[in-house]
């Protein structure tokens, strides 16, 4: 059964022309751009329950503030409001995917890692918006940018892309702790010899 894909583009960075370069069928893609987090969660829940949609992509988890945060002054402290909200949202998403056992639903959540300052021991890397997503997700893949690659052209040299490392840090549906690297090309450089800048 052919089903559709939905992109919840909170960052508002997706452009149809650029997506078409990667083979995305813009006619079949459902593109939504919510402005409030509460609307975002309701939309994702409805998409996951929709029989015609099998894949929902959220880009990105850290790009939108809570309704409470947006509606108040910059001086007002909102302690962990995003974490509390996303903890509840993850449970709603899980319930939506489990509501129909015969329907295959997949939710891809893009998030960002940050370096926490003042950490003398242990891992300073933190993921925003609470711990619920770590417990809920079945598969977690970490992407990290590596060396930029340049190519010599008639005008000099240009950056044509960079190597990306990926690591499967959690996997409930397969073998975890696997890693790989791949080359992400920025432009079609016509097979020009590439070399590392580092």
Where are these regions (language model features)?
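Alpha-helix C-terminal capping segments
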Residues: 1, 21, 136-140
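Generic low-polarity alpha-helical segments
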Residues: 1, 54-56, 107, 193-198
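Conserved inter-motif catalytic segment of the P-loop NTP-binding fold
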Residues: 2-88, 92
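Phosphate-binding/switch region of NTP-binding enzymes
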Residues: 47, 79-196
């Amino acid at each position: 059964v052919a089903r559709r894909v939905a992109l919840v583009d909170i960052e508002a960075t997706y452009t149809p022309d650029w997506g078409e370069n990667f083979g995305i069928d813009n006619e079949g893609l459902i593109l939504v751009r919510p402005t409030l987090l509460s609307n975002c969660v309701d939309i994702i829940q409805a998409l996951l329950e929709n029989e015609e949609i099998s894949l929902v992509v959220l880009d990105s988890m850290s790009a939108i503030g809570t309704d409470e945060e947006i509606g108040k002054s910059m001086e007002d402290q909102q302690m962990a409001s995003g974490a509390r909200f996303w903890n509840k949202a993850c449970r709603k998403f899980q319930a939506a995917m489990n509501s129909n056992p015969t329907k295959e639903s997949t939710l891809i959540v893009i998030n960002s890692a940050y370096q926490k300052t003042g950490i003398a021991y242990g891992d300073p890397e933190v993921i925003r918006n609470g711990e619920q997503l770590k417990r809920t997700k079945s598969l977690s893949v970490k992407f990290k940018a590596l060396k930029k690659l340049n190519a010599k052209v008639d005008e000099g040299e240009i950056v044509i892309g960079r190597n990306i490392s990926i690591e499967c840090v959690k996997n409930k549906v397969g073998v975890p702790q696997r890693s790989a690297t791949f080359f992400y090309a920025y432009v079609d450089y016509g097979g020009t010899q590439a070399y590392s800048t580092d």
